[in-house]
Amino acid sequence: MAVKIKLKRLGKIRSPHYRIVVADSRTRRDGRAIEEIGKYHPTYNPSVMEVDAERVAYWLGVGAQPTEPVLAILKKTGDWQKFKGEPAPAPLLQPAEKAARPSFEAIGGEDEGKGEAITQKKKADKKDEAAAESSASEA
């Protein structure tokens, strides 16, 4: 049985996500896979490439052939060079850690509570008018 390491497409239209899978070469692109050995998310910045190096080494060792897109991913992660016995490539770009947003208190803001309302509330106006009318009728 001819085995290939290929990309299985997931996601929505214009939002692709791929799984790196080992499958029979005669199966459909998104068909049944023997094993899932990684992920590839090209729309993220930088794109995410997660590969299980042990399983890739095993499948390459037993004769699985990577497709061209998977071969490019394996070269970027260094798994292909490790299999061929070549020197490893430069490390991949890692996403920058997002700094926590400074809190309001850390900036120096002081919580003064609620200020006075610019407009009066309707219920309060009605009570004030009713009280004024009753005091006017008493006098």
UniProtKB/Swiss-Prot annotation:
Annotated spans, Disordered: 84-139
Family indicated by similarity: Belongs to the bacterial ribosomal protein bS16 family.
Disulfide bridge map: none
Protein name: Small ribosomal subunit protein bS16
Superkingdom, natural source: Bacteria
A GO biological-process term: translation
MF terms (GO), sorted A to Z: structural constituent of ribosome
Pfam families: Ribosomal_S16 (PF00886)
Keywords: Ribonucleoprotein, Ribosomal protein
GO cellular component: cytoplasm; small ribosomal subunit
